[in-house]
Regions:
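Contiguous, structured surface segment used for ligand recognition
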Residues: 40-165, 488, 504-529
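Active-site neighborhood of glycoside hydrolase catalytic domains
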Residues: 296, 302-397, 404-411
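Extracytoplasmic
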Residues: 607-764
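Gram-negative bacterial Sec-dependent N-terminal signal peptides
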Residues: 20-36
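Feature activates predominantly on carbohydrate-active enzymes
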Residues: 107-317, 322-331, 372, 376, ...
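Flexible, acidic glycine-rich loops studded with aromatic residues
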Residues: 384-399, 405-550
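Short, compositionally stereotyped local motifs that mark structural "simplifiers"
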Residues: 513-638, 677-685
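Surface-exposed loop/turn motifs at beta-strand-loop junctions within extracellular Ig-like
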Residues: 128, 595-599, 747-751
């Protein structure tokens, strides 16, 4: 192969030109417009705006890459990097390479790009650096699915995003994540063409950003004691400090890293509410005489508000000056949500200020408070972003409203000519559960399945075309109250963040069967890159009933692929029978089940040795909660070392119902129970939580049949379960009737902290 004399690089141009002439003639004859069926077969996520399929394939196993300037080389290096990480071939740079990255000024929009694949080569074109980068990632997706022959189909892709703001929010205040994880998340966002990283850095539970002028914000505000057993050293009994913060050097590193991946970092400094960490660091900024001395370990809406004094605005100005210096992007998020006004109402000086300002009430005062910050940022060339509560006051025309109370805030903002981002609860809140499996991590218990998530419509019909232009985009928010580890964060984020990308980039017409196939391909790419995601919704779930003969009813929460099973102990394969209806099985059989998308295995294989005991055991997750006031999956506070269980409970009413429990022949109950600290700030609602008085100091588990007001058939003392952190087994005799009956499980106890939870129940 000839070499370029100037560079010494191999020159593929003569060969490529000859092949290209042949290819262009063939393509002109057989090029076809893509159909819906063709699009469904492409392993791309998000789906490009336009695709045209041509005849033939391109072999890239020995191809080289041509790139001429900084932007094209960065895109080429991204392709090389992703291929290397996913087990693909090593493609070197060469003048005249058959994979060519180049500028095309006719492609409008910095993020737009075109990818053309012919049997002779690949052409990736864009006018902007981001477009070149995204073109490289789309090409990698095609290559990652190519298989051992390393061939991709001839086609042409013209692509651009539907929305400018395609975001993910990470809450680093409730639980601190290391810099390496933050960068990994940003890298994964870039792979999905997500371009806005909203970094929630301050809250009641911690302050996470170094501010030179106020060192106590991190020396005091970054650290707390965890609730319950987790807050103490098991060897010494002394309190354990928990938390952390990001130094300025680390933040600059993260911001620079994000810039190389075309991701804008939007920091959030949440005020005037969610301010306990600030008040602990500087009590003079509080609205009460004796503010907390440390950040809180409680979850919920705390009443602590900053005092709207001149000292507070001096503090905020100094903080924002340092924040602006660290984050060069156009946006600064100032929170503004969930500001309970009780402390302002009770403070005479604050009431006097309301009158002096000529304001109506405390809500108007918050509007004035937020407007001062917005004006401060505007004078420094930044746009304020705030949660939709900021609409209650004077909102600058260039402010961005982040709509979390459903989509109403975005609609109001757009109709008033202001920009908005859709981040509605619950659908875009990534701390909601993805299935009701007992294997799910902690989080809010209202289930937002993948299909429900995908069906969200980011273009409200009530808006005109002109008003819709004010919808900058959408964002998924990961609040981390119940997500203490980065492994759990990955499971809550992925693959749902990829669905956010699909909605924000493609804004597609809904076609779940097609999308689920592409989602399976995206999951496969995560596995190739060795990146974590939540496989639990892909796993089969089973309910067993019967005694002499067992009926197994199967389902898969994700509704992706096909469940296939074996009953001879072998591992399921793509050729195993598909599950179509409940299975009738004999005790002694081993049922093995796994999902497949075509030949691709999904999730994990579940195995159940069939016995009557399966029908006599239920986890709490398989039961119904008696109430739905604050349903959560809560991570146990113990053991202090090792894996902790996650409990399914309504903290306002700890009570579980097992429908149709098979009581015939049962004489004893074995229950797995645990204790959790009550660390929830729920205001006066705490008075609504009541328990029956206990007969013994530790309390009892009470089991009733045929409803929670039905006959008491078991009372099991809990004293033995208090001797360990984590969970413990307790047991007791029951007085069962024959047949199937609903069982209701509740606890007796003296107070609400700690409170008992049920993990599973077995009838013997």
């Amino acid at each position: 192969m000839p070499h370029d004399r100037a560079t010494g690089l191999e020159d593929e141009r003569p060969l490529m030109a000859k092949q290209m002439r042949k290819t262009l003639f063939a393509a002109a004859v057989v090029t076809l417009g893509i159909t819906a069926a063709n699009a469904a077969e492409l392993p791309l996520l998000p789906m490009p705006a336009s695709v045209t399929v041509a005849a033939g394939t391109f072999s890239f196993s020995n191809a080289r890459i041509e790139a001429s300037d900084i932007g094209t080389k960065a895109a080429a290096q991204r392709l090389q990097e992703l291929l290397g990480r996913s087990g693909g071939p090593r493609l070197s740079l060469a003048r005249g390479g058959r994979i060519r990255f180049h500028r095309d000024p006719s492609i409008t929009g910095n993020e737009a790009y075109r990818v053309t694949v012919t049997p002779a080569g690949v052409d990736v074109a864009a006018s902007g650096d981001a477009g070149l980068y995204y073109g490289a990632e789309t090409l990698w997706q095609l290559m990652a699915a190519a298989g051992p022959n390393k061939r991709i189909a001839a086609l042409s892709i013209d692509d651009r995003p539907a929305f400018a703001w395609r975001g993910i929010m990470l809450d680093s205040a409730r639980h601190f994540q290391p810099v390496a994880y933050v960068k990994q998340l940003i890298d994964r966002m870039a792979i999905a063409k997500l371009n806005t990283f909203h970094w929630h850095l301050t809250d009641d539970q911690g302050w996470r950003i170094q501010i030179d002028r106020y060192p106590r914000l991190t020396s005091v505000g970054a650290w707390r004691q965890e609730a319950g057993a987790a807050g103490f050293d098991p060897k010494t009994g002394k309190p354990v400090r928990y938390g952390g913060y990001y130094t300025k050097a680390q933040i600059r590193d993260v911001v620079a890293y994000a810039g190389t991946r075309h991701v804008t970092v939007v920091p959030e400094i949440d005020v005037p509410g969610h301010a306990t960490a600030i008040m602990a660091a500087d009590p003079e900024l509080a609205s009460i005489p004796n503010p907390p001395k440390s950040p809180s370990h409680d979850w919920g809406i705390l009443p602590n508000l900053l005092n709207p004094s001149e000292a507070t605005f001096t503090f905020l100005g100094n903080v924002l000056d340092e924040v602006i210096a660290l984050f060069p992007g156009p946006y600064i998020h100032v929170g503004g949500d969930e500001a309970v006004k009780d402390q302002w109402k009770a403070n005479p000086a604050i009431q006097a200020r309301i009158k002096a300002l000529g304001l109506k009430d405390e809500d108007a005062l918050q509007g004035w408070f937020t407007a001062q910050i917005g004006d401060y940022l505007a004078k420094r060339g930044r746009r304020m972003v705030g949660w939709d509560e900021i609409l209650g006051g004077r909102v600058a025309e260039d402010a961005v409203v982040m709509s979390w109370h459903g989509i109403d805030g975005a609609i109001t903002a757009a109709k008033s000519g202001r920009d908005a981002v859709l981040a509605p609860s619950p659908i875009m809140y990534l701390d909601h559960m993805q299935s009701d499996s007992a294997d799910e991590p902690g989080g809010r218990a209202e289930i937002i399945g993948w299909r429900d998530f995908y069906n969200f419509d980011p273009t409200p019909a009530v808006l005109t075309a002109d008003e819709r232009r004010h919808l900058l985009g959408l964002q998924g928010n990961l609040w981390t109250e119940h997500i203490p580890t980065t492994d759990d964060a990955d499971r809550m984020l992925w693959p749902r963040a990829a669905i956010v990308a699909e909605l924000a980039w493609s804004n597609p017409k809904k076609d779940w069967p097609s999308f689920s196939t592409r989602l399976a391909a995206d999951i496969r790419r995560s596995e190739q890159l060795r990146l974590g995601y939540n496989s639990t919704p892909l796993d089969p779930e089973a309910i067993f009933t019967g005694s002499d003969v067992i009926t197994a009813t199967l389902r898969q929460p994700a509704v992706v692929g096909t469940l296939r099973y074996t009953t001879d102990g072998s591992v399921p394969s793509p050729q195993s029978p598909a599950y179509l209806a409940p299975l009738t099985l004999k005790p002694g059989t081993t049922l093995s089940v796994r999902a497949f998308e075509g030949t691709q295995p999904l999730g994990t294989t579940k195995r159940w040795p069939i016995s009557a005991a399966l029908a006599r055991t239920r986890t709490a997750s398989e039961m119904e909660l008696c109430g739905n006031a604050i349903p959560l999956r809560i991570v146990d506070d113990g053991p202090t070392a090792g894996k902790r269980l996650v409990h399914w409970v309504d903290v306002m009413h700890p009570c579980w119902i097992w429908h149709g429990a098979p009581l015939s022949g049962a004489h004893r109950i074995v229950a797995q129970v645990g204790q959790l600290p009550f660390n929830f700030s729920i205001g006066d609602d705490v008075e609504k939580i009541t328990f029956p008085p206990p007969a013994t100091p530790a309390g009892e588990l009470q089991v009733r049949r045929d409803g929670c007001d039905g006959k008491l058939i078991a009372t099991i003392p809990l004293a033995s379960a208090t001797k360990t952190t984590g969970v413990a087994d307790v047991s007791g005799a029951i007085e069962p009737p024959d047949g199937a009956h609903d069982l209701c499980m509740t606890f007796t106890q003296k107070g609400i902290d700690p409170y008992w939870v049920l993990d599973r129940l077995t009838l013997q």
